[in-house]
């Protein structure tokens, strides 16, 4: 693909975002206290394609896991959970992140906080120390003081090529 075609595609995608083609679009994600990320790290998704690059341990996978867990019905606990060997130390604060999304071009931004809590066991549900749920907006984290919104409704496809490509293929192909 030549560079002119690439530039045309980028312009077209930018116009699509400006015209509101992408519904339930996550505009940004903020990490007040999440894994090894610097507190209040924020990513703004100004364009519908974002590339995360950086050294090992820089938080790329952690960011993707949070984005995976953002929509309704999904959780980052599929990837981040406490074990006896690798416990999650909260340092006196609950791991959490929030994001803002628009349902359509003209809607206001709705902010959703996701917080890791320890859910106690009940008759119908077992105890879960790695349970993530939405919580009320927290002014101390820089959220707009509005109401508690439901998570964005989106289908998620998570591809992790480390799990898809074998070591043999990585080395010999």
Give the residues covered by each predicted segment:
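P-loop NTPase switch/coupling surface
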Residues: 1-172
């Amino acid at each position: 693909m030549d560079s002119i075609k690439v530039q045309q595609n980028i312009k077209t995608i930018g116009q699509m975002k400006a015209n509101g083609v992408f519904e339930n679009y996550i505009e940004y994600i903020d990490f007040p206290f999440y894994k090894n990320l610097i507190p209040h790290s924020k990513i703004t998704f100004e364009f519908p394609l974002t590339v995360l690059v950086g050294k090992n341990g820089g938080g790329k996978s952690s960011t993707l896991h949070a984005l995976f867990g953002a929509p309704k019905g999904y959780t980052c606990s599929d990837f981040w959970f406490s074990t006896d060997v690798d416990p999650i130390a909260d340092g006196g604060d609950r791991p959490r992140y929030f994001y803002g999304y628009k349902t359509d071009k003209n809607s206001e931004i709705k902010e959703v906080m996701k917080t890791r809590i320890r859910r106690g066991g009940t008759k119908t549900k077992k105890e879960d120390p790695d349970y993530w749920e939405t919580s009320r907006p927290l002014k101390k984290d820089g959220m707009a003081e509005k109401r508690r919104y439901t998570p964005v409704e989106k289908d998620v496809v998570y591809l992790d090529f480390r799990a898809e490509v074998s070591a043999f293929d990585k080395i010999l192909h």
